[in-house]
């Protein structure tokens, strides 16, 4: 049971990036959505540093996160207090490799059912890099979008609700 929980933890943390991650640099929050979307979509290299939290009815977890993205290559490092539970997630756009405790598991991103079968979590792996930047993924089309002052506030996509509480200029 503990091994299953440990394997699911990185996936849960990835999911929470959409709600807890700092947003990309913004210079003018009054930009209209079309120009904002174009600017965010053009970003193909970025680094995210922050903290995230997971709360369920029976437990809570927190982690520090560093996510480096360059084109389709991603490197995500998660760690708990004092570096405990260090996990590395890397991807080349086709495969996702999750390394923890000296063991690595590889998944084909194009078959999310394989990730779900292995981890128990049906995560939108391909959508996360878009969501972290404040964008809906290209497919499927989002529903129920809310845009305010040229910035995405919330949307629903592929059964997930994505909500941005605030943006930060850096």
Predicted regions, residues:
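Bacterial signal peptide processing site
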Residues: 21-24
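Gly/Pro-enriched, hydrophobic low-complexity segments
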Residues: 135-170
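Long, charged/polar, surface-exposed segments that mediate recognition or autoinhibition
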Residues: 115-117, 121-134, 141
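An acidic-aromatic
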Residues: 73-124
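One face of beta-strands
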Residues: 44-52, 61-67, 72-78, 85-89, ...
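Post-signal peptide N-terminal segment of mature Sec-exported envelope proteins
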Residues: 27-55
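C-terminal motif of bacterial Sec signal peptides marking the signal peptidase cleavage site
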Residues: 16-19
């Amino acid at each position: 049971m503990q091994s299953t929980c440990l394997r699911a933890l990185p996936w849960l943390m990835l999911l929470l990036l959409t709600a807890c991650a700092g947003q990309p640099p913004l210079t003018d929050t009054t930009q209209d959505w079309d120009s904002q979307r174009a600017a965010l979509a053009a970003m193909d290299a970025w680094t995210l540093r922050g903290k995230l939290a997971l709360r369920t009815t029976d437990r809570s977890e927190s982690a520090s996160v560093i996510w480096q993205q360059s084109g389709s290559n991603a490197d995500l490092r998660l760690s708990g207090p004092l570096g405990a539970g260090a996990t590395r997630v890397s991807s080349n756009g086709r495969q996702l490799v999750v390394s923890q405790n000296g063991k690595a598991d590889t998944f084909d991103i194009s078959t999310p059912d394989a990730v779900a079968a292995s981890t128990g979590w049906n995560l939108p792996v391909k959508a996360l890099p878009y969501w972290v930047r404040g964008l809906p993924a290209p497919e499927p089309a989002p529903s129920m979008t809310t845009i305010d002052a040229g910035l995405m506030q919330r949307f629903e996509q592929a059964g997930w609700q994505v909500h941005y509480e605030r943006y930060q200029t850096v």
